[in-house]
């Protein structure tokens, strides 16, 4: 069970519990003083109001815009129960989440996946239908060191030995830089683009990424066993998972859904929530 799913369900529980009593009703009494619904709501709003409201609105918008069958929800829910076994009911009790609330969260998650799927083009699917390649790399911090390593390779020195000597990647350096086989979408874009241009046993020029500079060597190429048509569903699933982790993409997608739903917030303290998101999206567009 994903923690994010539990968190989404939990925020709904908090908000719903605040709606079940009148504003002056006491939800806690003690010798130290009482707590009313209004006091609780204001405190909750101050500490987590924007996040809670964002989650609740997104849940409603996604479920409204993308139809999810009950059988899809039940299947996903059963998978979660099976994954956590005997701990499942305990986790729900700890979070104060009812089955119905969690299923609503599951429905929203599946609706979000459908929203992402709708953005995936045939070109993207074809671009990600690639052979698996096996590669090694030497990762260094600066361009000067990368050029030095490339020069030493040109002098006939062993790629594996230079990886052990220079590479900053602790996970692969002792294996001579070996990264094993990987497919499309598994590496950062700069690395992947460079690696897929190489032939077997060919070595790249220094490639800059967020991690530093890479010298890449392709050591094997494995052509796909399945046809493109047979692979489409798996490729789409991987792209959905990848895009769901892309904050900029998801913010842009959700803002489009919010705009279509004509969302307006009446609470004076929270009314700018989606305006702030629109501003953030515009900043990203200008970069």
Curated annotation (Swiss-Prot):
One of its GO terms (molecular function) is peptidyl-prolyl cis-trans isomerase activity. A lipid is attached at residue 19 (N-palmitoyl cysteine). It is found in: Cell membrane. Keywords: Cell membrane, Isomerase, Lipoprotein, Membrane, Palmitate, Rotamase, Signal. It catalyses: [protein]-peptidylproline (omega=180) = [protein]-peptidylproline (omega=0). It is a lipid-anchor. Residues 1-18 form the signal peptide. Belongs to the PrsA family. PANTHER family: FOLDASE PROTEIN PRSA, PEPTIDYLPROLYL ISOMERASE. This is Foldase protein PrsA 1. It comes from Bacillus anthracis.
């Amino acid at each position: 069970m994903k923690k994010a799913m539990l968190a989404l369900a939990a925020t709904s529980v908090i908000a719903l519990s605040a709606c079940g009593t009148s504003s002056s009703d006491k939800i806690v009494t003690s010798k130290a003083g009482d707590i009313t619904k209004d006091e609780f709501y204001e405190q909750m709003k101050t500490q987590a109001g924007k996040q809670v409201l964002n989650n609740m609105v997104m849940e409603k918008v996604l479920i409204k815009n993308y139809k999810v069958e009950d059988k899809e929800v039940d299947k996903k829910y059963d998978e979660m129960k099976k994954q956590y076994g005997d701990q499942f009911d305990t986790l729900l009790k700890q979070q104060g989440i009812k089955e119905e609330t969690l299923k609503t969260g599951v429905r929203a998650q599946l609706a979000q996946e459908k929203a992402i799927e709708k953005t995936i083009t045939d070109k993207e699917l074809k671009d990600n239908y690639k052979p698996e390649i096996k590669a090694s790399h030497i990762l260094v911090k600066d361009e000067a060191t990368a050029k030095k390593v490339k020069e030493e390779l040109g002098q006939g020195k062993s790629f594996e030995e230079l990886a052990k000597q220079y590479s900053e990647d602790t996970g692969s350096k002792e294996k001579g830089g070996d990264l094993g086989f990987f497919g499309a979408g598994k590496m950062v874009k700069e690395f992947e683009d460079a690696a897929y241009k190489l032939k077997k046993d060919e070595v790249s020029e220094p490639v800059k990424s967020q991690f530093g500079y890479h010298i890449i060597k392709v050591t094997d190429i494995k052509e796909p066993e399945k046809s493109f048509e047979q692979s489409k569903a798996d490729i789409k699933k991987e792209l959905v998972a990848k895009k769901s982790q892309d904050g900029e993409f998801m913010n842009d997608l959700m803002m489009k859904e919010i705009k279509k739903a004509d969302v307006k917030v009446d609470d004076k303290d929270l009314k700018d929530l989606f305006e702030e998101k629109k501003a953030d999206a515009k900043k990203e567009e200008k970069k």
